[in-house]
Amino acid sequence: MAVEDLKPSQGTVKTGLRENAVGLPGMLMQGIATIAPSFAILASFVFIVSWAGLSTPWAYLFGGALLCLQALNAAQLAKVFPSAGGWYTWIARAFHPRAGFFAGVLFSVWLPPVGALTLSYLAYTVLEPSIKAEYGVDVKWWIWVIAGLALVIFFAYQGIALSEKALIITGSIEIVIMVALAITGLVSAGPGGFSWAPLNPGNFHLASNLFLGVVFSIFAFSGWESTGPMAEESKNPKRNVPIGLVGSVIILMVYFVFVTWGYLVGIGVSKAGTIPTATAWPVATFAQHVWSGAWVFLLFALLNSAIAVSIACFNGGTRTWYAMGRSGVLPTALGKVNPKRKTPDNSIHLEVGMQVVAFACVLIWGVSDVFITWANAITIGLVLMYILANIGVVKYYLTEGRAQFSPLLHVVVPVIASAAGVVVVWKSYFSPFTSSGPVFWGLLVFIAIVVVTILALIYMRIRGQEEWMAKAQLVFEQSGTSH
């Protein structure tokens, strides 16, 4: 069937996954856990303070607001095109299948290696040195990685219901601990005492470059996108997936603003300028000061965060591969499910293999370099994926979805979100341009991803293997409606 022959009424498919297994709390936690609340603070707080200073909570607020616009755009597609393919299907259906293929490739590079890379980065930079310094016990970082991955893989094979319950538990624990630490900071303020200064917009002029603080805060929110591939296992996906997309960003925006305010006050508003040059992670130093021996709960929160994000990315990555295998653009074996557990076992097998590859890369090239290179490559790719989805929103609602067309939602918001994405990439990678280090290598990896994607599309075109283009647009049809 040619793509042009696919009528909207024909574009549905039944699922082999377990329908109605995940409620709204699970959908929200899928996005929240992939953002990784405590790990995101580890990866972004010090860097953003170096640009935004006391106005760091505002940087997270503005960055979150911009991503709310993008999440709102994605929700416009999710509510009409529910599918385990997520962005792959949305873009294929609303814009073009070849554009959707890029989203599928990006998800294949983004979500599958998260477990090995996140656990490696956390264990190498925090867990091993902290446990050794605090207790004199030398637990090698790679032991944490292997143990963590074993747990994540176990949950993946057990089925979506159990893994989502584990996700809710681990994700909730980390948020409670991080918020408790922030409250402690507000109650037991550091030098400068309790202060509203971090929330005062009158202090914007004190930031060295608040704009760059906003730009880099956007990186902390990446992960909400993984809610999309859970559609076929969600209750009422046309409602819950859009809420999960937008809701996870809003919840984390409030979280980031509150906890960074608490940490700045706890560390000391008069010492905020020393945060970027601290030899140890300032949040950990602060936790040791106010919680004494109980500061180990911070390590527990970080470990929970790494486990939760790994589970969430396992789920999102395998479901995307399942949909791509079902459409035939990837080996059809990936579209098969276990008849008992309703899990895409072959996709899970492949995901386990990706952990091995990612871990091997870490051992060869080093934890920090591999993690930062990968993170930068994915960031550029996500912005391009956003823009493709935004084009799809405009195209769909000006044509097939004309009856629901809204100039604000379907033109203004997509244009603003796309423009913001372009500015983020420009300021992050080209102004100024760097020709060395992980940022540069991340740019090269992104270019390689695009080249491989184009070559694959050309190859399939030459070979006449284009049946997948129609199947890529198939939208999930529920066997029954669950509210």
Q: Where are the model-predicted features located?
A:
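Membrane-interface "cap" regions at the ends of multi-pass membrane proteins
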Residues: M1-S55, L61, C68, L72, ...
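Helix-loop-helix junctions that connect adjacent transmembrane segments
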Residues: V13-R18, P57, A133-K140, I168-V296, ...
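Select transmembrane alpha-helical segments in multipass membrane proteins
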Residues: A21-G31, P57, A65, H96-W110, ...
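Hydrophobic transmembrane alpha-helices that form the core helical bundles
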Residues: A43-S50, W58-A59, C68-L149, F154-Y157, ...
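Transmembrane helix-loop boundary segments of multi-pass membrane transporters
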Residues: V46-P57, P129-W141, I160-G171, F297, ...
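TM-loop-TM module centered on a large, flexible mid-protein loop between adjacent transmembrane helices
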Residues: T89-W90, H96, E128-A133, G244-F314, ...
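Membrane-interface loop-to-helix entry segments
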Residues: K140-P191, S222, G244-I251, G381-L384, ...
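A generic transmembrane alpha-helix motif of multi-pass inner-membrane proteins
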Residues: I372-M385, L408-H483
